[in-house]
Each structure stands twice: as C-alpha cells, then as structure tokens.
Amino acid sequence: MTQSTFSFNIAFTQSVNPPDQTVVLSATELWYGIRRGGRNPHDFAPYVASCEVLSGTQNEFCRKLTLADGAVHTAAGEDLIQDVIIAPPLHVQAKTVTTGATSTFLLSHGTAAKEDNERPELFLTAMYELKLDNVKPGTQAAKDIEFNYTALARGACDNAVRDIRKWKTEGKLAAWQREAEQDGAGVSNKGEILPYKD
C-alpha cells in the first residue's frame, strides 16, 4: 500500500502602508525587498543558515539552502535544493526539487480607483505549499506541523515587511536598486520593468 503525501497550504497577507505607519514603502521599494529573498533568503528567514546559487539566470535559478534551527520539518544543517522563479515586479517563488513544496512572496496592489502616490495601497502575501512523504495525514505529527507551519508563515509575512522597511531606513534598498539597474535587472525608479540580462 502506498503512503499518501501529506500536504498543507497556508497564506498570509499584510497591508504594507497602514495609516499609522511613518516609513512608507513604494511599490518599487517593496519589490526590491521581496526580490532580495530570491538569492538571500537568510536575510528574511532565521531558519535559513546560508544560500548558494548553483546555476541559472537572474530571474530563474537553482539554489541550495542550508537550514538553521527553527525550521518546522527539517533539521539544522540539512540542505534543500530549490528552483527559483522571479517574476518582476510580482513575485519570488521557490520550489523544493525533491518534494514540490513551494513558497511564494507576492506583491499586490489595492483596488482603489486612484493610486495614492504618498501612501500607495500595497500588500505582501506569503504563500506556503508544504508537501512531505514521511508524515501521515491526520496524525498528531501532521497536526503539529500544521500548527507550527502556520506560525512560521505568519511570522514570515510580518517579518518580511518589517525587514524591508528597516532596509529602506538603512539605505540598503536604494543601494540594491542601483546595483540591479546597473546590471540591467529589475524595475526602474519610474516603476518600469527593466529587461533582464542572462
């Protein structure tokens, strides 16, 4: 008898520029923060110890993550190989080669008829599609993973916006944008998508 694959899907969305926030992010700034996670996920996730890009282009590549403490279903020191797709200025998606588990960080806009340039209505969504072969659905182990993975996903969404805001105040977002534009990658300061060089 074949054991069924355990899967658990969860997503959280956060408003990026609520009325009480004094450090407002533009869509371009939010995008460069999200984009940073493709090659540098350890900047966002404390459970990632390091990341090495193995092959690929600027917007499609293979990376190796080495995990630290705090991951839900993997041990510290374990490596994950992931295929990453960056779709500027929309999302960064990473898919684990062995299981098909996927994480996506998505930038979206509100539906207001007129954009507020002083405080744009932006959202960050963190989506996680977990797949595991060594966990039986419906067991206590599966329930524990669902509980802990929900907390991890919620924290990832909260922390990503907080970190991107901090990077803006530290001047890092502007520096990363300049580097990307010099390489011909990313989004211009006018919000236009620039072509990627392979």
Give names to the regions the model predicted.
Residues 10-12, 63, 82, 122-124:
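Hydrophobic residues positioned within well-ordered beta-strands of beta-sheet architectures
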Residues 53-100:
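Glycine-rich portal/gate segments that line the openings of hydrophobic small-molecule binding cavities
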Residues 16-18, 67-71, 128-134:
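Beta-strand elements of well-folded, non-transmembrane domains
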Residues 1-56:
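Hydrophobic ligand-binding cavity/cleft-lining segments
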Residues 140-197:
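A conserved amphipathic terminal alpha-helix motif
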Residues 19-20, 113-116, 171-175:
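Alpha-helix termini
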Residues 95-158, 162:
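Beta-strand/loop substructures that line and gate deep hydrophobic ligand-binding cavities in soluble
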